[in-house]
Amino acid sequence: MPRSFLVKSKKAHSYHQPRSPGPDYSLRLENVPAPSRADSTSNAGGAKAEPRDRLSPESQLTEAPDRASASPDSCEGSVCERSSEFEDFWRPPSPSASPASEKSMCPSLDEAQPFPLPFKPYSWSGLAGSDLRHLVQSYRPCGALERGAGLGLFCEPAPEPGHPAALYGPKRAAGGAGAGAPGSCSAGAGATAGPGLGLYGDFGSAAAGLYERPTAAAGLLYPERGHGLHADKGAGVKVESELLCTRLLLGGGSYKCIKCSKVFSTPHGLEVHVRRSHSGTRPFACEMCGKTFGHAVSLEQHKAVHSQERSFDCKICGKSFKRSSTLSTHLLIHSDTRPYPCQYCGKRFHQKSDMKKHTFIHTGEKPHKCQVCGKAFSQSSNLITHSRKHTGFKPFGCDLCGKGFQRKVDLRRHRETQHGLK
């Protein structure tokens, strides 16, 4: 179709609509100067333009329709929609265009160079309040960000009052299993509700396992965890009355027994101490003498007593021992080192355990009790010797006559009196 049919004459709509009091945006002659910024500002403010002479060249130009309502600060029609008045601006050049003799009145239309398109400005007042809510989301301030700095917390946007997320939470509204309060803080996809728990919501199974899956050692060290949030998950943990130990912060993170106030550097040492000394649980028993131990390593070391092999020899006196710990204690005799004195009588001992056993003489304490007859002893060695009376076990035998004895001192006396050996 020739371009001449696309250009509208001034008779088509020049007398149907009044002149625009504002600046004319559709002047199509390049020699006509564009209105200045000051003029457009004054006209937009409501000032009337000067009347034009009908015989002036400007009156012969094609006049655009009234665009007073389409000022740069308003948009009453459709939002950013192309108007029908600019149809010839939008239409691309056709391959079968008219010849040069049929060019339009405006030479700028025939040029291939780009030119500014008269878009209508975007108007916020033309939209309803519900249409603007999805464009601008209100984020509520999160107080937990100050408390949990560095924990990766973030705030979720608060949904609309009628949105399903406001009633069921963002996850259930989307089809998920979890639900969260609108505008609440979360730490990932699986944040839980409640103070303190949200800060540890979804930081991996390792961090959550420290609080939800207490082990046997954790149950011994922290008996109060059996009551509270995870009481149902700590059914296998002993009751607090049987644990007799807790952790006490002593500078370097030491562990203190609440029964005897003994301090340990590791939780494992405290656990072994409670099992051996206070709980009465000694599950490892010797097959030869029946002595029980609280740890498997202690039982293996004890089995060396029943063997005749003495592989640890003293280089000073030549005396041999079955265990290296016994040799270390023996070496203190040659050095005459007794660093552990008794607080009652001042007697000094090579080992701390010997000093502790000695103090029972002054205090009268007898912590070792026989399970058969109920007799109590101040030292564990005396209880072991006493228990052989009930079992009939005689570990010390004479190599000359084969007679057995329950105590080593009885064997030595037998050798001196019956065989004349010293």
From Swiss-Prot:
Top-rank lineage group of the source organism: Eukaryota
Predominant localisation class: nucleus
GO cellular component, one term: transcription repressor complex
Zinc finger (C2H2-type): 255-278, 284-306, 312-334, 340-362, 368-390, 396-419
Molecular function, one GO term: transcription cis-regulatory region binding
UniProt-annotated location(s): Nucleus
Induction / repression: Down-regulated by TGFB1.
Residue numbers spanned by region Required for interaction with RELA: 140-257
Residue numbers carrying Phosphoserine: 20, 56
SUPFAM superfamilies linked: beta-beta-alpha zinc fingers (SSF57667)
Region span, Disordered: 1-109
InterPro entries: Znf_C2H2_sf, Znf_C2H2_type
SMART domains: ZnF_C2H2
Post-translational modification note: Ubiquitinated. Ubiquitination and degradation by the proteasome is inhibited by the ubiquitin ligase, ARIH2.
Record region (SNAG domain): 1-20
GO-annotated biological processes: cellular response to lipopolysaccharide; DNA damage response; negative regulation of DNA-templated transcription; negative regulation of neuron projection development; negative regulation of NF-kappaB transcription factor activity; negative regulation of transcription by RNA polymerase II; negative regulation of vitamin D biosynthetic process; positive regulation of interleukin-6-mediated signaling pathway
Keywords: Disease variant, DNA-binding, Metal-binding, Nucleus, Phosphoprotein, Repeat, Transcription, Transcription regulation, Ubl conjugation, Zinc, Zinc-finger
Variant or mutagenesis effect after changing residue 403 to R: In NI-CINA; Neutropenic and elevated monocytosis but no history of infectious complications. No effect on DNA binding but diminished GFI1 repression activity
Effect on the protein upon substituting residue 2 to A: Abrogates transcriptional repression
Disorder this protein is connected to according to its UniProt record: Neutropenia, severe congenital 2, autosomal dominant: A disorder of hematopoiesis characterized by maturation arrest of granulopoiesis at the level of promyelocytes with peripheral blood absolute neutrophil counts below 0.5 x 10(9)/l and early onset of severe bacterial infections.
Domain notes per entry: Zinc fingers 3, 4 and 5 are required for DNA-binding and for interaction with SPI1. The SNAG domain of GFIs is required for nuclear location and for interaction with some corepressors.
Function (record text): Transcription repressor essential for hematopoiesis. Functions in a cell-context and development-specific manner. Binds to 5'-TAAATCAC[AT]GCA-3' in the promoter region of a large number of genes. Component of several complexes, including the EHMT2-GFI1-HDAC1, AJUBA-GFI1-HDAC1 and RCOR-GFI-KDM1A-HDAC complexes, that suppress, via histone deacetylase (HDAC) recruitment, a number of genes implicated in multilineage blood cell development. Regulates neutrophil differentiation, promotes proliferation of lymphoid cells, and is required for granulocyte development.
Subunit architecture: Interacts with U2AF1L4. Component of RCOR-GFI-KDM1A-HDAC complexes. Interacts directly with RCOR1, KDM1A and HDAC2. Also interacts with HDAC1. Interacts (via the zinc-finger domain) with ARIH2; the interaction prevents GFI1 ubiquitination and proteasomal degradation. Interacts with PIAS3; the interaction relieves the inhibitory effect of PIAS3 on STAT3-mediated transcriptional activity. Forms a complex with EHMT2 and HDAC1 to promote 'Lys-9' dimethylation of H3 (H3K9Me2) and repress expression of target genes. Interacts directly with EHMT2. Component of the GFI1-AJUBA-HDAC1 repressor complex.
Protein's recorded name: Zinc finger protein Gfi-1
Native organism: Homo sapiens (Human)
UniProt gene name: GFI1
